[in-house]
Structures are given as C-alpha cells and as structure tokens.
Amino acid sequence: MTDPTDRRHRTAVPRRNSVPRLRGRTRRVVPRTHWLLLCVLVVTLSAALLLQGYTHHMFGITSDDVTGPRGRADTVPGQVAHGGPVIADAAGSPHTARPKAGTIALTFDDGPDPVWTPRILDVLRRNHVHATFFVVGTQVVAHPELVRRIVAEGHQIGIHTFTHPDLSRLAPWQRSLELRETQLAVAGAAGVTSSLLRPPYSSENDALDDADWSVLKQADSAGYVTVLSTLDAEDWQRPGTARVLANATPHGKAGQIVLMHDAGGDRSQTVAALNTLIPRLKAQGFRFTTVGAAVGMAGPVQPAGLGNRLQGITLIKMLQLGDGTIRLLGVLMYTAGAISVLRAAVVLVAARRHRRLRTGRRARPWGPPVTEPVSVIVPAYNESAGIEAAVRSLVASDHPVEIIVVDDGSTDGTADLVESLGLPGVRVIRQRNAGKPAALNTGLAAATCDLVVMVDGDTVFEPDAVRTIVQPFADPRVGAVSGNAKVVNRGGLLGRWQHIEYVVGFNLDRRLFDLAECMPTVPGAVGAFRRRALLALGGVSDVTLAEDTDLTMALCRAGWRVVYEEGAVAWTEAPASLGALWRQRYRWCYGTLQAMWKHRGALVQGGAAGRLGRRGLVYLLLFQVLLPLLAPVVDVFALYGLVFLDPLRITALWLAFLLLQLLMGLYAFRLDGERPGPLWSLPLQQFVYRQLMYLVVIQSVFTAVSGSRLRWQRMERYGTLRAPAGAETSDEGRPPRIPA
C-alpha cells in the first residue's frame, strides 16, 4: 500500500530512525586524453615490435652451408668468376681487385659479439694488426659500443646486412632495406658509413651464380663494393684450432682475404688460432692490413652525415626499445600466467572446501531457523520495464516480508505502476531524485524489521530466496549475507558470456571470500543485512559508485561477518549490448577502486578488518586490477609469437590456459547446479569480452589516478524478467504480511 504522506510531499521519510545521507559532489568527466595516449603508445609499440620481430626472427645467423646447392652461372662475367675477391662496378663494366702480394686482410663476419669480438680485438691490438669487420645490423643495435671500439682502434667496418638473410632469395626492396638499415645502424652507433659489402653465405668468386650476380649488381647500384674471400677458415664449423689455423694459412706469397667469424657461436677456436696465425705469418714476411688498404681503395669508410646519424640513432633506440619491450612482455606474460594459475588453484580448492562446509554431510546449521519478518527495500529509478515482475516475485516469497519500494524521482511512472498493482504488504515511498544510496537510506529509515533485504528493481527472487538468505543471521556474528545472482537473459553470445562470468567468476570468488572471512561485496541485486549494523555505520554512503562494495567493506571493518548463501537465488537482467555492458562494468570497476582506496586502512588493522585488508583487498588488487592490466600484455605477446616465434608453441600455451578456464567453468557450473552447455562459447569469450573487460579496468584505473569523479548511470532495462509462477495478486494461502 502507499503512504499518503509520502505521496503528497514526494520526499517524505519517516523521522524515527532516520539515516543521515552522505552526500558527495560529483562531476561527470569523460576522460579521453588517455585513450589518445594509449593509441599513440600502441602504434609506437606495434612499430617497435614489428621491426624487432623482423630483425630478430625472420632470418638470423646460421651456418654458411644452409643455402643449398649452387645454381647456374650463365650471367656471371668470366672476369668476375676468375678474378679477384673485391668486385666493383658490377652493374656497369665490372672489374675486380686482389690484395697485393705478401698482404693479408683479416675479415670477421657476423659480429659484433659481446664475448668474442672484444677478445679478437685484444689479440689484434697486442699484435698491432688492423682488420675489417663485416657487421650485422641487429648486432650493431645490440652492441653499439663495440662498433665504436672497432672504429676507434683503426679497423674498417663493412656491411653484412641487417638480419643475415640469403640476399639472393629476397625481393629487391628487401635487399635495399637490409643494406639501408645496416648502414643507418652503423652511422648511429659509430658515426661512419661504409661502402664495403659482404653478402651472407658468400665465399669465393667461383661460387657465384646468377642469383648472386643479381645481388651484386643491385648492391653496386647502391654504391657498394662487394668483398668476397680467398681463404675460408671455416671456423663456423668448429673443426678444432689446428684445422682453423691450417685453413687460414696461405700457400705461397699471394695476397689473401681471410674469412673468419667473431660471432654466431663459440669462437674460442678462432681466438686461439689468431694468437698463432698472426705471429707466424708476420715472421714469414706477411703484412696485415684492412681490405681497403690491401687493394688500394680510397676511403671506403667515411664520416656519416648528420641526417644519417640522427636516423641511425633513432633506429637503434627503436630497436632497443623493442628488445626491452619483448623482454618485459615475456616477464609480464609469465607473471600473468603464474597469477592465473595461482588464482585457479586457490579458488577451486576453496570452492570445494566451501561446498563441504555448507552442504556436505558434516555441514553445521547456522542455528535455529530464522522466521522473523524481513523488510525488503527496492530502490527504483525509471524501472517500469521490470518493477512489476520484481515486486510480484517478492510478494510470492514463502517468508513474511514487508516490501518498501522507494521511487527515486522516476519519470516513467514506476511508482504509479507499483501502486496500481494493489499488492498486499507493498508500500511505495516517493522522493526527489537523489541517487540509489539516498533511496536505500530512505527505505532503511522506513523499515520496521531488524533484517533487511536490498533488491534492485530489475531483479526477480525465487520464492524461497528471502527465507534462505536470512538463515545465516541465526549466527549473531553475521551482519550481511550475499545471495546468488543469476543472469536471466542468457540468449546470444553476450548473454552467455555474462552468464559464464556470473557463475565462474563472481560466485567462485564469493565462496573463497566466505571461507577466508573477507567478503568485499554483497551485490545490490540480492543482499541481506542487519538493520542495526547499517544504522551504526550511518547508513549507505554515496561517496563511491559501488555503494554495495563500500557498505560491505565497512561492515567487515566494523567486525561483522559477511557470508555467501548460494541457495538464495535471484534473477537479474544483464546488459544486452556492448555499450551498456561497458557502462555497467566501468561503474562497477571504478566504484570498487574507490572503495578499495577508501578502506585501505584495513591493511594494517587487526581482526575482521585485517582479514578484509590483507586477504580481500590484496586479492582484489592482484586478480581484479593487476591481472586485467596484464591481460593486454598476454594478447600482444601471443600475436607477436604467432607471427615471429613458434606458432605451435604459442597455440599450445593458449589452449592450456583455455583448458584451465574450461575446467574451472565445469566445476563452477556443477557447484551452481547449472547445465554446462553455455561453456561452448568460452573460447569465443577470449576475443571480444575479455578485451572489453580489461579495457574497462584500464579506463577505471586512469580515471581513479587522474582524480576524476563519475556520476551514477542508470542501466538499460529490457523487460525480460517475469514473476515466478503463482505470484498472483491475491494473498490467500501466503505467509503473513507485515502491515505497512
């Protein structure tokens, strides 16, 4: 029935037992700057990762015999095939050059390497010998200080491509990119450029084929002189120091270009061979010099221009950023995986134990049956789509109730609709729009029972839900009880995904919180409280957007125990669009962060408050804040791995985590008495729903850190709820009602 006084004055609230309202000024802020920054970060990160992936995983340094058999050599000029190892003007009138007699040009490929290049440089310095180092761009980026040392100690730099591919198998644009990026890396690292090129997997002139010749002609057009070799130490095969020494030793006094390696594996045999080779050949009258000096080239290495140096420095920084990012992503991904596995183990063990304690053979009752009447408060703002079903379901309860519908300034006739139903034991109180906490406080002030159930206007109760949810109050330590909210509109993928989340996420967590005595949230859809406990707190606060979480945490800190009653089932409408879901979860997440910050003092308190702080708040921080923040890392690394790493391994890891989620889902559905059919959509949940959830957390964290305040947003209602069978308007055969 309707209180005529409330109806006349619209905002009247019973004066006795009034609850003070906590008002907080809010301003609606739609933060957008961080999304722009996030987009810039994503674009920059993507570019760095793509470049890093290409440079580190598309090709790479491998043994010199991996390119297969030699092809036809119909287009290779005879003077090149039988000429000297230094080839110039390949695109025009090609000519070659040989080192002068008695001259040795030591050359080292594939470096610089942080272990072996310094040791080789030390050997060269002790013997007062200069050499030529054909560097790989990725190694230059990783160790620019070694390139600077090579140049500073008087050695020559040559280009050995950026990623060490077989250039003959690349498209012309890829060849140009390989040479250009290596040149920029050298310019950025040491401030020089080089016109010397040694293609990977090359050897002597007579090994050139038509594909190789096309590479040499393109390189000549770009201004490069190709440097092959006359002696191959074959140190990459690690045949033993004696064999390396023999391979690098010339026969006779002819000038030689010796091919060796300062990277690409263990080069201890190379270092040992050099310690013997250089003194021995010097004693035989050989002179050691660089490639340029050996063939009389004028200045193959020149200072780089300012533009090239700046571009090179930028390239190095970008690639170093990519390298560091990949290392960080790897650490974060394994951290996220460990946290996920830890959560799964803890939640599953806790859920099993909770089930045994509550419904097993050794389960203990809370105490004598609770039969005292209950006040049910329904805050309503523009709830005409579902309020009738909600109220009728409450009227159909098998427990004595008084139902107080607090209309918070609705403009859609919500209050009139409830009044027109003429249901017994139902009272409507009208007030100007002041928000949900104010409406709850109004209902709390009007309630006549010590036990209070709070119900959202879009929620339908099972007939036994009220009776079931109040039974834990037989224990005088219990101050609040969380019910079991279920999604009613499960049609479509979005509905199924939310249904899975409610069963697997929310309800499994509540079992853990109940067991650990650190329940952080009694949901607004279905929760029961001791009225005197709420009055002692000053009522429902409006300083956060998650008034239910704030209230529950306050009760825990006041020493009350908060428990979960899985048998108290209520059906609620879930958002039916991604936009509505975003708004709901944004409010939930932001409000939860507000409540966590407000009650952070519980971390250092003792007793029930300490359990909330050190168990509940830490759990929320780890699994509802940090883990979602790490989720994008997992996605980015997975995409990176599929493109540049082993896709089978990445897929196997993804399937393993999916299997873990499926096992959790099956167990949670079994505990909740649900059919597992909707779990078929779990794999699809990983591609839209999951991303939406972690973006919500990112948005909420930014909003919280920036100090913005958001206004409470009403959810869309769809009218899919129906009252349970038997909820007629007659009160015949029903439990006694409390007069309004």
What does each model-identified segment do?
Residues 338, 342, 347-368, 619-706:
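Membrane-embedded multi-pass helical conduit in multi-pass membrane proteins
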